Every structure is written in C-alpha cells, then in structure tokens.
Regions:
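Conserved beta-strand-loop surface patch within small alpha/beta domains used
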Residues: 1-89, 96-176
Length: 176
C-alpha cells in the first residue's frame, strides 16, 4: 500500500493549527482543506490548494467531544471542492492530553458523510484529520467510500509530521 502524504506550506500549517487549537479550547474546532491529488510511484500525495475554517455559525452543534455542521456548511464546502476540482480534507480538533485518534462518533459520522462526498465529488479521495496539541491522526478514502487507510504524514517544508495511526480502519467495533 502506498504512503499517503499531505503537503502543506509552513505558514498554512501554522494558521490551521492556530485556528483549530486556540489557547482556551472550549469546543471542537473544524475546517476543510482543498487539495490536489498527485499520485507518485511510492506515495499518494495531496497538495494544499486552499483552506476554509468553519465559522461559529457553520456548526449546528458542537461541544468539547462532538460537532455537527449545518446543511449549508456541508453544501458550501462540497461545492467549493467541486468548483476547484479538488479533494476535501476535513480537519477537526480534540481537547485533552491523550494521543490523537478519531472518536466513535467521528467514525460513525464518516459512514454517512464520506459516501455522500464521494458521490458528489465523483469519486475523488476524501481525507480526514484529527489534531491535538501534540500530534494528529488521519484517514484517507482513496479507492472507495467504505475502505479507509491511514494517512502516513504531513509534509511541511523539509519536515514530516507522522500520524499516530491509532484510529481503527474498520467500524465494526462501534456498530454494536
């Protein structure tokens, strides 16, 4: 299986992490990155095109442990990806001091949202990252909307941040 790498300029990385992880994180923050897909010999490379931070009125609900976007927000980010001809990368933050991993509610949300985005963007890959103050985890749906694989790293300049890879690739654990 090829590595999955997300390339982000250093200034963009700093801005994204600052937005997602404010000094006093009262609830999960979220945003979407628009990326171009550049398959290479040994890696699936996704390169930054644009960033959209979700404003407070873009959430239907959010807390320290869960968020839900408004229908208008979901439609807006999907339409923008369609107009740009890009894939979407969902980013959101988790509070706390434990290593980054998607929660059960995150994984269940992917079961509904990823197939919808996959259909709307005509089979373009979908990526999702969860970030904490110390690390990140990520999943990528490259070949179909039901089979994720881990994101290996984020390339920032000459450095690579590696994923915790703590999130399960199968949802059956959470379907009981």
């Amino acid at each position: 299986m090829a590595q999955v790498l997300l390339h982000i300029p250093k200034k963009v990385h700093q801005a994204v992490w600052t937005q997602l992880l404010p000094r006093h994180l009262r609830s999960e923050e979220a945003g979407f990155m628009y990326v171009s897909h550049r398959p290479q010999d040994e890696a699936e490379v996704f390169e930054y095109v644009d960033w959209y931070p979700i404003p407070s009125n873009g959430f239907l609900h959010r807390s320290r442990y869960h968020f839900e976007l408004t229908d208008e927000t979901r439609a807006r980010v999907i339409k923008q990806a369609h107009d740009l001809g890009t894939s979407l990368v969902e980013f959101h933050s988790h509070a706390g001091r434990w290593p980054a991993a998607f929660s059960a509610s995150d994984l269940l949300g992917f079961q509904e949202f990823v197939p919808h985005v996959w259909w709307r963007l005509k089979g373009k890959p979908y990526l999702a990252l969860v970030v904490t103050r110390t690390n990140f985890d990520g999943l990528a749906w490259l070949t179909d909307p039901r089979t994720p694989q881990h994101i290996d790293g984020i390339v920032i300049g000459g450095s690579v941040l590696t994923s915790t890879k703590l999130s399960p690739l199968k949802y059956s654990t959470y379907e009981q």
